[in-house]
Amino acid sequence: MGFYLLGKLKLPNDSDVKHVSTPRLVLAIITLSFTMYMIPGLWGAPLKSISAFLPPMSTQDFVLSAGSAPAVAHNSGNHKYGEIFHAPLGLDAFFDYDEGLAYAKKMNKPVFIDFTGHACVNCRKMEASVWPDKEVLSRLSNDYVVIQLYVDDKTDLATAEQTVSKYSGKKIQTIGNKWSDLQASRFNANSQPFYVLLDTKGNLLVQPQGADYDPVSFSKYLDSGLEAFKKSVQ
């Protein structure tokens, strides 16, 4: 596009560009600069300024920002719905609330719930621009049991798990129905991303919050949950 604006590329019916006007030159510079900015993304480099509009980092073959924080081995085994969902940044996340909470109780660690969605632009922005931060990723990898719950997933639940919500009276037929009902009934919220920090009994450690694009601030939020958890087990 940039070369076309400069007259270096032409379509069959285009006339010769003998003079490049100032507006055309400015547009060409902007287009070429943006193209150069995006090129590193082909090899997995994070593009934070446009991360909200890009596919999840977990869909890339490799990510240059992954591994920026040391992680410990969890040995948590295969996870329910693990064939459907994939956590970003190599995180050992669960995709079922009860399974994740049971593992947190076993490991005596607090729970980080991420109510998210396939179509959630702000969720992707958090995963691409905040979660890779060294301090944030270290806490998510080592200090919390991460549970990602997709509220818009259309996969049908097993017949035995399909039910009617006591909260809304609506039929819970899909995975998304189940987790959106949990978010609404327990935490009175329906926006994503929505982050909840719990102890091993499922009790709130601190007030839930939504997107926070400041890594330092988000790290402090995670720290506040850790402090509350330590006090609860003393």
Feature annotation, model-predicted:
Residues 1-113, 117-234:
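Proteins that catalyze or organize thiol-disulfide redox chemistry
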